[in-house]
Amino acid sequence: MTRRVQYRHFLWPRPRLDAIDWLMSDASYRDAIFSTPLDRVANFSFDEKVVACFPDMIRRSVPGYGQILGMLGLIAERHLRFGAHVYDLGCSLGAVTLALAGRLPPDAFTLTGVDLSPTMVARARETLGEECPDHRIDIVEGDIRHVDYRPAGMIVLNFTLQFLPPEDRRAVIERLYAALEPGGVLVLSEKIVLPDEQENAWLVERYHDFKRANGYSDMEISQKRTALENVLVPDTLDAHHERLHEAGFTRVSTWFQYLNFASMVAFKDA
């Protein structure tokens, strides 16, 4: 029988739950990467410049990111088998892992975070080592398409799949389904596109309004969009749901959407 625990009765040294606010501790790390005119806009990459301002970039560019983080901890608290393994794929600076560690005690789970950026990995190791010294967390550099996955109770893809070539996404989801234990949960957060061109254009404009309200100029918005054009290729929600069902998931729900950003949860039958 699966052992589930009401973790709120445990006391342990917790990291700050609002991981983004904690990571963004120095105003000098404001995202200004695209604030000057560029003769040539290179493809977006998670290099040292991006890592330095990443928390601010995420907070001002991804609607609802903080709410998603908070719910990930609650989803894990509700559905994760005690002692199970967790994967944080595309872990960046470790915000998802911090959110889980803020809800679950050190003996409740083990976790592997994977990221392709060596700079992200180094920073995440430093952050999590300081904030979660008692949790069993391993951050590794690697490509999620080629990880040798061990059985896991929960897998999180938080705005990660969208950066893979579209033709590789189905195989990744199939491998993650195979790695999940019966009753395991996959959380998939993605930027999305609407199938109706007019509706999608309206949503994109409101997203640009969101960024303007958060201090980005029209030039920054335009140059960032150009940088991401061939790097981040979004899918429709229907395409995501179809892919998840075809991989074997029978329960798939979109539990969160803010403008053209959404998060889905998929369960493997027990």
Curated annotation (Swiss-Prot):
The answer to whether UniProt assigns keyword S-adenosyl-L-methionine to this entry is yes
Record-level Gene Ontology MF annotations? carboxyl- or carbamoyltransferase activity; S-adenosyl-L-methionine binding
Q: Please, one GO biological process term?
A: tRNA wobble uridine modification
So what EC number does this one have? 2.1.3.-
Q: Where does S-adenosyl-L-methionine bind?
A: Y65, G90, C91, S92, D143, I144, N158, R225
EC class name = transferase
Q: Which UniProt keywords apply?
A: S-adenosyl-L-methionine, Transferase
Disulfide feature? none
State the source organism's domain of life.
Answer: Bacteria
What is the catalytic activity of this protein?
A: prephenate + S-adenosyl-L-methionine = carboxy-S-adenosyl-L-methionine + 3-phenylpyruvate + H2O
Write down the Pfam families for this protein, in alphabetical order. Answer: Methyltransf_25 (PF13649)
The protein's role, per its UniProt record: Catalyzes the conversion of S-adenosyl-L-methionine (SAM) to carboxy-S-adenosyl-L-methionine (Cx-SAM).
Q: Family membership, please give it.
A: Belongs to the class I-like SAM-binding methyltransferase superfamily. Cx-SAM synthase family.
Subunit and partners:
Homodimer.
Specify the protein name.
Answer: Carboxy-S-adenosyl-L-methionine synthase
Q: Which organism is it from?
A: Chromohalobacter salexigens (strain ATCC BAA-138 / DSM 3043 / CIP 106854 / NCIMB 13768 / 1H11)
